[in-house]
């Protein structure tokens, strides 16, 4: 499969590629040894998002972070498939099988939390434990016919995508990132994060056309593995509501909050986040 990847990217000694049964070649980084721990990135991100986790948790686990199809560095790796959360669920399950990893400790953030949640539902034999950090997606509340993102959030994301489509990439990214974190988050973010988001800006319009599925009491009841839910103390209300509700719906779920942090809590407070994950998995 033809993938255009900069030579400097291939120089990363931790970078490898897994060829899946579907034909997709999925890039990933791996570090450490021991029980396998797989990290699933969210919107505008890729395997680089998890650098603070691999740097620490690889002392205890075989840490593996893939970039899902359509994301950097191999934006053409999944070109034959539509961008969709279900395709990402399927390919992540294939990825775990291809590397003969399962069952794994699965960690997902934001949109990646939704993907990880649905891998645990649809492929329970592949997941030993599940950690969801600010999981993205709407909540299906009892008595409500159809769950969806709040209208204000949807309108803002649509405006952000329109800016990107018009070539005002950084303005669109700033609007989106601030909306899922807190005002000023984009300007305060590191140049490394901004570079990663710009590299993945083309995925945001695709994401808007593919709404995440709702969490419901019924779907949460399908989660059979040990589960940890993490939110940031300053994360937007929709993420904190997801963590609050899922911690009640998923049997025997544990819950932790990263003090002083917003949506990117794993990067803002990596020592605390890593401790929560390690203590949960090792218990």
Please report, for each region that a protein language model flagged, where it lies by residue.
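Conserved HGGG/HGGXW glycine-rich cap/lid loop of the alpha/beta-hydrolase fold
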Residues: 17-81, 95
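Conserved acidic catalytic loop of the alpha/beta-hydrolase fold
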Residues: 86-104
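Short beta-strand immediately N-terminal to the catalytic nucleophile in serine-hydrolase-like folds
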Residues: 106-108, 133
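Gly/Ala-rich beta-loop-alpha elbow adjacent to hydrolase catalytic centers
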Residues: 108, 112, 116
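Flexible "cap/lid" loop of the alpha/beta hydrolase fold
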Residues: 117-122, 126-164
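Conserved alpha/beta-hydrolase catalytic His-Asp/Glu region
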Residues: 165-205
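Conserved loop-alpha-helix segment in the C-terminal half of the alpha/beta-hydrolase fold
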Residues: 217-264
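Catalytic active-site module of serine/aspartate enzymes centered on a nucleophile-bearing elbow/loop
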Residues: 251-283
């Amino acid at each position: 499969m033809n993938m255009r990847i900069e030579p400097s990217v291939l120089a990363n000694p931790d970078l490898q590629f897994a060829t899946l049964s579907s034909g997709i070649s999925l890039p990933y980084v791996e570090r450490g040894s021991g029980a396998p721990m797989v990290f699933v990135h969210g919107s505008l991100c890729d395997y680089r998002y998890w650098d603070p986790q691999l740097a620490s948790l690889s002392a205890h686990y075989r840490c593996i972070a893939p970039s899902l199809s359509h994301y950097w560095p191999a934006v053409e790796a999944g070109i034959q498939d539509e961008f969709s959360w279900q395709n990402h669920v399927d390919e992540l399950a294939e990825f775990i099988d291809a590397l003969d990893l399962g069952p794994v400790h699965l960690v997902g953030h934001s949109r990646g939390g939704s993907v990880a949640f649905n891998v645990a539902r649809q492929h329970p034999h592949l997941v030993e434990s599940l950690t969801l950090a600010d999981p993205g997606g709407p909540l299906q509340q009892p008595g409500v016919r159809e769950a969806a993102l709040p209208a204000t959030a949807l309108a803002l994301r649509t405006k952000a995508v329109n800016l990107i489509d018009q070539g005002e990439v950084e303005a669109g990214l700033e609007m989106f990132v601030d909306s899922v974190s807190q005002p000023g988050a984009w300007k305060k973010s590191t140049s490394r994060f901004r570079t990663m988001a710009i590299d993945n800006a083309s995925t945001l319009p695709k994401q808007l056309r593919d709404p995440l599925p709702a969490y419901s009491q019924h779907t949460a009841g399908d989660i059979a593995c040990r589960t940890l839910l993490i939110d940031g103390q300053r994360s937007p209300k929709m993420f904190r509501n997801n963590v609050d509700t899922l911690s009640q719906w998923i049997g025997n779920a544990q819950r932790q909050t990263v003090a002083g942090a917003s949506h990117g809590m794993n990067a803002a407070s990596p020592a605390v986040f890593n401790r929560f994950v390690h203590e949960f998995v090792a218990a």
